[in-house]
């Protein structure tokens, strides 16, 4: 990992640390009360990991804004990145098996 990439990951890692602390310390006290799948904290974790700091935070804020009695909830997965959208058809054809690449 380059130093520049490492520096870009610092805000993501700080946010992930806050999310993990919430999941370990606060969430068990509240119980399972999220009206979405995945839960809002897991959604935020996935969004930050796949979309980076700015877009991950934006997606997380939008999701938390929907989490209330005014929204029915349900399944709400993190949107795919552009790269995931491009690679998905090839993964379906390949079946996700990369054994043909090994010697």
Curated annotation (Swiss-Prot):
Presence of keyword Oxidoreductase: no
Membrane topology of this protein: Peripheral membrane protein
Role: Could be involved in insertion of integral membrane proteins into the membrane.
Coarse class of the protein's main subcellular location: membrane
Listed HAMAP family: UPF0161_YidD
Family as reported in the entry's similarity comment: Belongs to the UPF0161 family.
GO cellular component term, pick one: plasma membrane
Subcellular location: Cell inner membrane
Signal peptide: none
Protein name in UniProt: Putative membrane protein insertion efficiency factor
Record's keyword annotation contains Transferase: no
Keywords assigned by UniProt, alphabetized: Cell inner membrane, Cell membrane, Membrane
Domain of life: Bacteria
């Amino acid at each position: 990992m380059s130093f520049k990439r490492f520096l870009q990951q610092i805000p993501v890692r700080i946010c992930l640390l806050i999310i993990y602390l919430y999941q370990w310390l606060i969430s068990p006290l509240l119980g399972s009360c999220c009206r979405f799948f995945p839960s809002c904290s897991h959604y935020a974790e996935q969004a930050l990991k796949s979309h980076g700091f700015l877009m991950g935070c934006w997606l997380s804020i939008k999701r938390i804004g929907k989490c209330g009695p005014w929204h029915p909830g349900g399944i709400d997965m993190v949107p795919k990145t552009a790269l995931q959208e491009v690679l998905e058809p090839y993964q379906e054809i390949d079946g996700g098996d990369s054994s043909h690449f090994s010697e």
